Every structure is written in structure tokens, then in C-alpha cells.
Amino acid sequence: MSTMHLLTFALLFSCSFARAACDPKIVNIGAVLSTRKHEQMFREAVNQANKRHGSWKIQLNATSVTHKPNAIQMALSVCEDLISSQVYAILVSHPPTPNDHFTPTPVSYTAGFYRIPVLGLTTRMSIYSDKSIHLSFLRTVPPYSHQSSVWFEMMRVYNWNHIILLVSDDHEGRAAQKRLETLLEERESKAEKVLQFDPGTKNVTALLMEARELEARVIILSASEDDAATVYRAAAMLNMTGSGYVWLVGEREISGNALRYAPDGIIGLQLINGKNESAHISDAVGVVAQAVHELLEKENITDPPRGCVGNTNIWKTGPLFKRVLMSSKYADGVTGRVEFNEDGDRKFANYSIMNLQNRKLVQVGIYNGTHVIPNDRKIIWPGGETEKPRGYQMSTRLKIVTIHQEPFVYVKPTMSDGTCKEEFTVNGDPVKKVICTGPNDTSPGSPRHTVPQCCYGFCIDLLIKLARTMNFTYEVHLVADGKFGTQERVNNSNKKEWNGMMGELLSGQADMIVAPLTINNERAQYIEFSKPFKYQGLTILVKKEIPRSTLDSFMQPFQSTLWLLVGLSVHVVAVMLYLLDRFSPFGRFKVNSEEEEEDALTLSSAMWFSWGVLLNSGIGEGAPRSFSARILGMVWAGFAMIIVASYTANLAAFLVLDRPEERITGINDPRLRNPSDKFIYATVKQSSVDIYFRRQVELSTMYRHMEKHNYESAAEAIQAVRDNKLHAFIWDSAVLEFEASQKCDLVTTGELFFRSGFGIGMRKDSPWKQNVSLSILKSHENGFMEDLDKTWVRYQECDSRSNAPATLTFENMAGVFMLVAGGIVAGIFLIFIEIAYKRHKDARRKQMQLAFAAVNVWRKNLQDRKSGRAEPDPKKKATFRAITSTLASSFKRRRSSKDTSTGGGRGALQNQKDTVLPRRAIEREEGQLQLCSRHRES
């Protein structure tokens, strides 16, 4: 027993010298509460926390004050009554006076300066989520903007895709708008319209009239009590609170003055335990107690500041304690599970879904933090309806956007009276045209003005069919920028927006896209596509290589080298035949001894034989006689047969079976896969084809080449192909096949790739999407789409060469006719030469005959003189003179003609030499006769 007394005495003695080691650490927690009653509740909650944790190391101590009438007094009270007590955290609630939302502000500012955490109990204004202003503020209730999550969940449950967001242009309204738009983006949707009004405004009629013109009938309102009352009064005057409408509001909008004017059937929210200050006091104390025990287990913990006077040092452990608080998870709270997000706001909160019925709020469902659980049987909708409204009004006037893309949409100017010219299809039916407004870009370089034009084609016929089937009217306009639609960066930022028809649809400028818009994944993420009205793929357009028939077309079967060898062979064989027959002892022979010997084969005859065998013209005469020459002739005949047969076969292939070869084989052609500047191919900028090549990694090399050469429109690219500025154009097969059928110098090549389809584009929340798809499916079934295809796409103006046998034309055989004409001209030219030569030869022969006759007379005269006859015979003398006279005149004419034609050149001298001997003989004869006559006279 004495031993126990000694131990007890030793323990008490040691504690008297080391009290700090034995006494628990006192942790002060401050609070600014609305009433004395809540201060008592705060102290009880602290005592309960001490008992719950039961730690002898730490003891929580409650220090509290009530709200002061103004901000200065409140800040002084925080400094003098709370911070001076070295509080680790401060709890703050709202004062009992309504609409005093700024009372927590002096507490937040004062404590935040020293980095002392502040826990709001009933403060729901979104401004306290801004940590650049309220550095150390946390709260056990969510902000009003958190109600956007409940609205979004109700939209999902009731499948409401058309909404109008009506918000006040203040911090609370903007916060609610931002949160809801973020949630809608995750769902790939958006509000049909966001309408803002200034806080405190007394007239929102114009704003509500704008909302009434929209399709959406679900109106989400975020405003203060007074502003909400103003909106309700204006909506009632415009009959916007009756059947068909849905009003979703928050807690403020069904409180106080707003509730007096709220229409029956409105759906509002109330935070469960949102105004239960005692419950939030208990939960806040539990969170702080849990965080304090976790904090004090760490090292280097400093004490909070003591007072504000002369103290400007922040609490170094304050930021750490705030992080510990924000990471706390208090599962046993009176108000439910308590957790904080990165802004210090409560993550999970439960709401009651309230329905105003006969001026009383009735709970018709709950929101458990993640899902809405409604009780549809208890809900009374606006107008006393018990059935859920569909949330939209089917507008019967739609704005249609399209694009100029033949044959789907043709665009032509209107006539002078503003109407469209009447035209007929290939079937004889009148072309259905509609007035469409769009930019007038017919004059390059001039400013683009929006003017009425005439639109018709495949898509216009389809639009007319849909409008008649689904009972709506429309107004058509052409897309302003001429693009189908792709995403592009805004001002070099990371934000991307759609341009073209996609941009107009998403921005609300159009309700529907009726155009050859390709269905792809990128677009389908943002808009809703109908069932395809036209299936197609991608193909390649090139300029057709039309064979040009030249005058030497008949020579195409053989190359130039082969023609030269054939021509050389003809003459070599002719010479060899002549030589063999010439030197053969049997080249000339007689049938019997009485007959004369036959003439040998001449070179001319050998040439005729060689050409005759080659051209199969028949040999009448001049055949070789010797055996050796005839052997060569037979070999030459065989050679000629093979050459002629080969030529005939190739001539048929070139002239009859000729087809233009495709320049490229398809998407895997080496000239496409390995691009070069010598072969240019492209597509349309910011189109689905452009997106396809950009997304495909294996086509990245092709895309880099195409990107530099892409065109603004398909029409420009097609014209570039025709002008040889572009070698290949990659685009939708339906369009390119039509262009190739209309423009005979173009042809598509290769197999289809990236198969897809054309669809009608609508917004995700469009009420028409299901009906449009059903109508298109019915049009496929009843053959209407097939008729449109035949009328607009399959109509061909160019003859299909593959369906008709190829025939020879004059162009193919013009060279042969020119060869015959050349032969005729050559024959005529040669006949004149032959005639001239013959005349020349006859004249010369006559001269020689006269010369020989004169010589004979001269000889006779000489013989007569030698025989002793003194007087010549007068007849012979007369004959001699006649001959000499004729020769002289002949020589003079010949000399004059030669001198004239040759200019006294070498030709005349040569001709004179040819007749010098006869002329000299005659001159000598004349001289002798004159001497004889003078001698006789003497």
C-alpha cells in the first residue's frame, strides 16, 4: 500500500515540474454566429468533439461572438475576441436579418489576412469561391451556382435538349451560366439561347418576347428574389407560364417576394438542411476537430497569431491547415457526407425538388448528390398539365443553309423580274427551283453582296420532298464563306470554332444543312446527321488522255528504227538480186537455139520486184532468172509476209482497239504516295477530305504535299485540272463522276476509298432529326432517291466509249489518204519530167540524124570530086544547103534557149560541146563548096 502512495506522490511531483508535458494542448476554435442560442450549440458541439476523439493530447476550446451591426464592428470583434485568443479556425454564419449576404465578408477578410481558415455555415454566394479574394474561406454548403448540376441532371432525366438560359448579369448569374455551359459541353450540347438582363431592371418584356420566338420551351432562371419576381410578372403577361412551358429555378427564385409572383407548375430547388445552422455548426466542428488532430501529428507546427494590433505576420501554419481541412472527408455529418472541392465549396449536397401547386410548394423529388429521383405522379406542370412537356415547340419555318456544289445544288441568277427561268430535266419534267439568298461572287475582285438567286438540283428536290412530307416551310440561303465546315483556331489560341455550314448551324444561323455534307466522326461529335441520302466514297479526277490522230498514224505500229530497217532491207535485197542474177551464168538463156537470148535482170527490175513482194502488188515481169537469186526472193517473200502481218495486227491495236490509259491507278499509286513537284494533286481546303488526310498517319506525306496546293472550292479545282494546272483532284465520287460525265475531257480513275455518305445536318437538340431520318428511309424504299440519282447524278452528256465498239474515223486514216495524194502529186510531177526528157531526147536524136545526113552528103561530094566530076549535082547542092540551114537554125535555137535557162553557164557550154563535131564538119563542107564555086567561076 505504501508503494502505491509513493508512486502517486512521484507522479504528482513530476507533474508539478513538467505541467506542459502532462496537460493537453488547448486548441481554440472561434465562431461568429447569429444568436446566443447558436453559441450554446457551438459549445456543445465542441464538447461532443472532445468526447468523440477522446485524446488526452488535444482539447478543443470554443470561443464565439454574435454578429455585429456593421462590418467595422464585426472586424474589430474578430480581432479582439477571436484572433487574440489564438484561434485555429473561425466558423461564420449569416445574421438573422434577411438578404444580408455580405456579413461574412469582414470575417473572411480579417481572418484571411493572417491565413486563419474560415468555415462558412450558410453562405451560398458564389463570390466566396473566388480564392483571389477570399483566401482562406471554406463552407459546408454549396454555392447557388451548384444548382446548375441539378438542372442539368433534370434535363437528362426528362430528355430536354432545348433550353433557354435566363440569367442576371451579375456574379451569381454568370457563375451559374458558366457551370451549366460547361456541363452542356461535356454532353456535346448547348443552350439554344442565353439571355442576360441587368440586376434590378424593371422591364424584361423585350427579352421574354425574344425567348418566345425560339423553339425551346424549357426556361432556366437564375436571379435574385426581386429580379425573379419581375420576370414572373412579365412572363404571365406574355402567356409564357401556361401549357407547354417548363420553368426550372433555384432556391432564391422561390423564396420571399419571388414566391408571390411565381407561376403554378414551376420547378424549384431547396437545399436540404441549407438553413439549419445548428446542423452545419455540428458538421463544421467535426471537420475542424478531425483536421486539428491530423495537423498536430505533423512537425514544425506554429501557434496562430495573438491579436491584430501591431501584428502583420501571417500564420505560417495557416495554409497547411487549410489544405488539411480541404482534404478532409467527414462521413458522419448531420447534413450528410462533408467534402470540399478545390474552391473550398462542399462537393456533395442534397436538394429537395419543389413544385408550386396552388400557391404552395410541394416536394416532388430529391437530388442525392449525383442523381435526380422525381415523383412524376405528384408533379403538376404549368397549365395544370400532368404529362411531361416535350420542352420545345416545333417551328414550321426552318432556316436552311446549303452550298453551291453541282449536281446537288446549282446556283443561277434570277431573271430581271426576280423569278427563276423555267427549265426542264432530261425526263421532260420541269426543274424545281427555289429562291436562295447568298453572296454574289460572279465578278472576281468585286465586293460580295447578298442577293437573291435561283437554287435547284438533287438536294433542292430532296428539301421540297421533306417539306411536303413533314409539313414545314423554309427559307434557303447559301453559306457565307463557301465552306462545308471544319474547326479552326480562334486568334491563334487553343480554342477552336467551326466555320462554314457547320459553324452557321451550331451558332443558330441555320436550323438544317441540306447539302452534300459528308458524314464523319469529327462532325458527328457536334451535330446530328440524318440517315445517308447518298452513299459514296472518294475518288480521283484526272484529265483524259484523248489520243490525237496525226498524219503519220498509220506508221505508229512500228518504231522509226524498224521503219528504217525495213526500207534499207528493200533496197539491199534489190541490189543483191541484181548482183546474183548478173553474175550467175544462168541469169540469161534461150529456150532453143533459134530464139534470141533474153535480157538479164536490170537494177530497176530488181527494185520493182523487191517492193512488189513487200507490198503484195504482184510481179508481172522482171523476176530473177538464176536459182541463187530466186532463193533470196523466196526468203524475202517470207520476210515480207511476217512484216505485213505484224503491221496489220498492230495497226488494228492502235487504230481500232485504242483506249486512253489511266494516268494513275488509285490512292496507292507511287506518284501519290511519293509526291513530287512534277505531279500536283490537291483537294478542297477545310473539307471532310482535307480532314481525312490530316487524320490518317499513313497519308501524312500526301497531306503535306496537298496542303500547299488545296483549292477554295471544288469548282476551282476541277477547272484547274482541265487547264492542266492540276494533275489530279481528290474529292467525293458522286461529284467527280458527274463532272466526268458532263465534261468529256475528264475521267475518274482508281477504286473508291474512304466510303461514307451524304447526310442532312441538324443540331443535337433538333426536334426534326428523327422525322428527317424516317422520311429519308422511306424515300429510299419507294424509289424516290433512285429517281433523283437518275435525274441529276447519272445523267451523261459524254458518250461512253466502253459501251460502243470503237470505229475508225477519217482522222485515224488521214495519213494514208495523204500518202495516196502524195503519190498522185509525185506521179504528175514525174510525168512532166518524163515528157520534158523525152522531148529533149527526140530533139537531140533529130540533130544527130541531120548531122549524120550532112556528113554523108559531104562524103558523097568528096567522092564525086575525087571521081572527076567538075560540077556538083544541083539537087545534091540544094539538099546540102537545106540540111546546113536546118542545122544552123537548130543550133541557134538551142544556144539561145540554153543561154536563157542557164545564164550562159556551164550547161550551155556542155551542150555546145555535144554538137561541136557535126557543126565543124558542116562548116568545113560549106567552106570547101564556096572555094570550089569560086574556082569554077575563075
From Swiss-Prot:
Residues 889-938 are annotated as: Disordered. Residues 603-624 dip into the membrane without crossing it. Keywords: Calcium, Cell membrane, Disulfide bond, Glycoprotein, Ion channel, Ion transport, Ligand-gated ion channel, Magnesium, Membrane, Metal-binding, Phosphoprotein, Postsynaptic cell membrane, Receptor, Signal, Synapse, Transmembrane, Transmembrane helix, Transport, Zinc. One of its GO terms (biological process) is conditioned taste aversion. Glycine binds at residues 516, 518, 523, 688, 732. Its main location: membrane. GO terms for cellular component: cell surface; cytoplasm; dendrite; dendrite membrane; dendritic branch; dendritic spine; endoplasmic reticulum; endoplasmic reticulum membrane. Residues 603-624 are annotated as: Pore-forming. SMART domains: Lig_chan-Glu_bd, PBPe. The keyword Metal-binding applies. Heterotetramer; the NMDAR subunits are modular and harbor tiered domains that function in concert to regulate opening and closing of the cation-selective ion channel pore. Forms heterotetrameric channels composed of two GluN1/zeta subunits (GRIN1), and two identical GluN2/epsilon subunits (GRIN2A, GRIN2B, GRIN2C or GRIN2D) or GluN3 subunits (GRIN3A or GRIN3B) (in vitro). Can also form heterotetrameric channels that contain at least two GluN1 subunits and at least two different GluN2 subunits (or a combination of one GluN2 and one GluN3 subunits) (in vitro). This is Glutamate receptor ionotropic, NMDA 1. It comes from Rattus norvegicus.
